[in-house]
């Protein structure tokens, strides 16, 4: 959607969801730095993000969702209900205590997702977002083609450059090639912590 720059306000989430479902790419504030995202089941939009950022396709991409319960049919382990409860509760407690978002690496039934989300890995990186507006946006993205409400979330920058921290910096990177959500982030100082769901190891 090159040449279709648009700035959405916080009260236009339905329009934002429609834009994303039509294949648009969006820069938006997250818990810390700005993110760059799209509907996680639109492979053309995902490839546009990878090309815009000059990102290694093997790295995979983080996705956001609004609640752990969305993942029930996706997670590829036994006792999934107790694990999902743990994910939700631990995420909430961790964010409250550390003022830092938490991204999980979880085993999945990979055949149901675009392979580019996983890259060269065997797990999906998923964050149960604590940003109120992004929670609402993920919910608005739920559809027959995206039953999990997944929103791609990669840092808003060119590969190896400093992530954007405000609208002006985001527009400086991508100009009229994408759209923007003009609202506030949560102001966390650090990027999300990354934790392996099964092994329990913190990787970042």
UniProtKB/Swiss-Prot annotation:
<comment type="function">
    <text>Required for the formation of a threonylcarbamoyl group on adenosine at position 37 (t(6)A37) in tRNAs that read codons beginning with adenine. Catalyzes the conversion of L-threonine, HCO(3)(-)/CO(2) and ATP to give threonylcarbamoyl-AMP (TC-AMP) as the acyladenylate intermediate, with the release of diphosphate.</text>
</comment>
<dbReference type="GO" id="GO:0002949">
    <property type="term" value="P:tRNA threonylcarbamoyladenosine modification"/>
</dbReference>
<keyword id="KW-0819">tRNA processing</keyword>
<feature type="domain" description="YrdC-like">
    <location>
        <begin position="10"/>
        <end position="204"/>
    </location>
</feature>
<dbReference type="InterPro" id="IPR023535">
    <property type="entry name" value="TC-AMP_synthase"/>
</dbReference>
<keyword id="KW-0547">Nucleotide-binding</keyword>
<keyword id="KW-0548">Nucleotidyltransferase</keyword>
<dbReference type="GO" id="GO:0005737">
    <property type="term" value="C:cytoplasm"/>
</dbReference>
<dbReference type="GO" id="GO:0000049">
    <property type="term" value="F:tRNA binding"/>
</dbReference>
<dbReference type="Pfam" id="PF01300">
    <property type="entry name" value="Sua5_yciO_yrdC"/>
</dbReference>
<dbReference type="InterPro" id="IPR017945">
    <property type="entry name" value="DHBP_synth_RibB-like_a/b_dom"/>
</dbReference>
<dbReference type="InterPro" id="IPR050156">
    <property type="entry name" value="TC-AMP_synthase_SUA5"/>
</dbReference>
<protein>
    <recommendedName>
        <fullName>Threonylcarbamoyl-AMP synthase</fullName>
        <ecNumber>2.7.7.87</ecNumber>
    </recommendedName>
</protein>
<comment type="similarity">
    <text>Belongs to the SUA5 family. TsaC subfamily.</text>
</comment>
<dbReference type="GO" id="GO:0003725">
    <property type="term" value="F:double-stranded RNA binding"/>
</dbReference>
<keyword id="KW-0808">Transferase</keyword>
<dbReference type="GO" id="GO:0006450">
    <property type="term" value="P:regulation of translational fidelity"/>
</dbReference>
<dbReference type="GO" id="GO:0061710">
    <property type="term" value="F:L-threonylcarbamoyladenylate synthase"/>
</dbReference>
<keyword id="KW-0067">ATP-binding</keyword>
<keyword id="KW-0963">Cytoplasm</keyword>
<dbReference type="InterPro" id="IPR006070">
    <property type="entry name" value="Sua5-like_dom"/>
</dbReference>
<dbReference type="GO" id="GO:0005524">
    <property type="term" value="F:ATP binding"/>
</dbReference>
């Amino acid at each position: 959607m090159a040449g279709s720059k648009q700035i959405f306000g916080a009260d236009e989430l339905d329009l934002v969801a429609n834009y994303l479902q039509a294949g648009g790419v969006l820069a938006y504030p997250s818990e810390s730095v700005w993110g760059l995202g799209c509907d996680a089941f639109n492979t053309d939009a995902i490839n546009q993000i990878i090309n815009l950022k000059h990102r290694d396709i093997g790295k995979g991409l983080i996705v956001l969702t609004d609640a752990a319960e969305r993942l029930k049919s996706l997670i590829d382990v036994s006792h999934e209900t107790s694990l999902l409860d743990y994910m939700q509760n631990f995420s909430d407690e961790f964010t409250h205590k550390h003022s830092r978002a938490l991204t999980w690496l979880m085993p999945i039934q990979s055949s149901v997702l675009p392979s580019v989300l996983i890259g060269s890995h065997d797990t999906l990186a998923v964050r149960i977002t604590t940003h109120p507006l992004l929670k609402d946006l993920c919910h608005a993205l739920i559809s027959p083609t995206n039953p999990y409400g997944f929103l791609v979330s990669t840092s808003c920058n060119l590969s190896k450059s400093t992530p954007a921290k405000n609208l002006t910096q985001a527009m400086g990177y991508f100009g009229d090639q994408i759209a923007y959500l003009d609202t506030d982030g949560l102001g966390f100082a650090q990027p999300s912590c990354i934790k392996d769901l099964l092994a329990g190891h913190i990787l970042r």
